[in-house]
Amino acid sequence: MLGAKIRFGRAPGLLPDFSYSPVLPNPGPLRPEDRLVFLHVEKTAGTTAHHVLAPHFPEDQVCPVRFGLHLPFWENARLARYRFFSLHASLRMIDPIPGPKKIVTFLREPVERLLSHYNFWRSLREEVIDEEHLDHIRYVKHLALKELLSPTPLATTPDFWNLHTQRLAGDLFMAPSGRAWRDEHELLDAALANLENMAAVGITEYPELSFQRIAEDLDIPNRYDGMRLNVTANIREDEPHRFERFEEAPMDDETAERLDRATRLDRRVYDRGKSLFRDRLRVGLVLKGMVPPHVPTAIEDGCELVLGHHQEGNILFGPYCALPAGSYLATLWLRAGAASNRKREGSITIDVCSGGSQKIHAVQSIRPLILSDQWFDPVDIHFTLADPASLVEIRATVAGLANLAVKRGVALRLI
């Protein structure tokens, strides 16, 4: 249960009918009568997705509204002019869009999404907040993470409580019938049901495959070129007049517990979204004759990251974004390129870092010749955290090697 401190629903008669429709199945290619709606959940690669999807439509068919709260104030005839909508919105907010809709969204590991969202708001300069009247962001900017995640301020900071679930269910406070949700389980069930009927779902951690899958589901060209826009870690360098440096939020046990509670429903949504994504990708590959049906595709926690000569790659531990102090043993699984393509002077470097690569905790070099080119070999790396650390990553760097495959599944244990 959400608890007595959170009041669902609104007073009878205070507002007009707020019932809305759940997502209706609309499979198949994008048709001329369809409206493509991109449901932009903050910090899920949504800005990138907008710039990939919008060029498929003439400029006068792209709705200029970016926030769903504004749609109810537009007449149906005006909304009917547009075929592409890219909105920070819940499903209830997009209900006024006329005609059949194909809804697309991206999902991101919930803890990482929440922390990125929090840090994005904290990095906004005060003068920008003043100029753009972003008082809700000012409130969050000056809140410690532990305070932000306490149960009581949900009414003022709903973006930091299971946001994927909220957006996909339709509304935080009311069910499609217009009544209050009975409990958080009903809210989650609605979100999962709507997720099943999405025209396409992308996973933030796998952008290339996500945009490929979306393009194939909608039967449109794939315009993704590797761009990454509005990335929290880079915004200060990209737009220094708008963003400033911020101190990383401390992560103690109580904060980690609150972070876990604030994302527990979203983890269910994210896991189901990854499963749907994997299944759709598998079907697409089978139809192309690329893999037999019994071979699992590589979009799971054990997904491969393949690096070529002089390439680098990061493997986010996820969901181990906030690890307590202590000594750890991480096990990776590596497979080297074909022996005939390997150079004896080649090298593989594995390191463990945290805080957006600011702290290096361990470095290990591996000779490519000790690795099999047919199966994955386990490689252990020990590291110690003197203090609790967030955004812990393992990085692999390759030199003098045709290719290296790294399984994204990392076994981690405290020793």
Language model regions located:
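PAPS-dependent sulfotransferase catalytic domain
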Residues: 70-105, 112-226, 359-362, 373, ...
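Noncatalytic modules at the cell exterior or secretory-pathway interfaces
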Residues: 82-83, 382-400
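Glycan-recognition and processing domains
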Residues: 282-325, 335-342, 353-365, 399-415
